[in-house]
């Protein structure tokens, strides 16, 4: 069995779909709009180094900060931090109440499978090998990608501000270090 799967890391591919859905839901709730009109992504490694791509977020094509102001919300950083922390910690809260997060994970897997089976060409934040995007090489990390009948058909290099690019690179470095550690532990070259 693959060492990544035996360490519980094989489920990384679907988690950003779930966290992105949570992010869109919370932004929609905050702004009192249908979350299907919210376009935002959680990217990177699932866990402490994941990040919300705020600079790319929008509501029906209107930049998120401008839409927030249109709805009477002016404390962007404070609201973004609160929403992000809620997304990041939601799994822990669900586990405390239900002892597991399998329903949300099942819905994320269902969504990915629908995209593949129906050849939807939907853009989802799924993990795939990076080849030069933001300087990342030979690392599997979650980024928006077109998902269709062949799985990940193309990674979508969304615009990120400098701080987000640095956070993403740190996330990639963390994953590379973890991969090296696992390979070393299992004698894989």
Region spans (language model):
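Single conserved hydrophobic/aromatic residue that forms the stacking wall/gate
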Residues: 1-13
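Short hydrophobic/aromatic-enriched beta-strand-loop microsegments
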Residues: 11-14, 35-37
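C-terminal substrate-binding/catalytic lobe of Rossmann-fold NAD(P)-dependent dehydrogenases
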Residues: 19-189
């Amino acid at each position: 069995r693959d060492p990544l799967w035996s360490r519980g890391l094989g489920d990384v591919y679907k988690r950003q779909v779930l966290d992105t859905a949570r992010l869109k839901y919370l932004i929609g709730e905050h702004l009192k709009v249908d979350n299907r009109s919210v376009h935002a992504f959680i990217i990177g490694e699932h866990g402490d180094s994941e990040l919300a791509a705020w600079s790319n977020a929008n509501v029906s094509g209107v930049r998120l900060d401008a839409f927030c102001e249109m709805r009477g919300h002016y404390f962007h950083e404070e609201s973004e931090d609160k929403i992000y922390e809620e997304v990041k910690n939601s799994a822990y809260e669900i586990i405390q109440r239900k002892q597991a997060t399998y329903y949300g994970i099942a819905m994320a897997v269902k969504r990915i499978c629908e995209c593949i089976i129906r050849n939807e060409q939907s853009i989802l934040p799924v993990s795939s090998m990076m080849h030069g995007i933001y300087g990342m090489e030979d690392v599997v990390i979650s980024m928006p990608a077109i998902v269709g009948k062949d799985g990940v058909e193309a990674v979508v290099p969304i615009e990120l501000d400098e701080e987000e690019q640095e956070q993403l690179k740190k996330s990639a470095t963390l994953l590379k270090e973890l991969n090296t550690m696992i390979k070393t532990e299992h004698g894989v070259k």
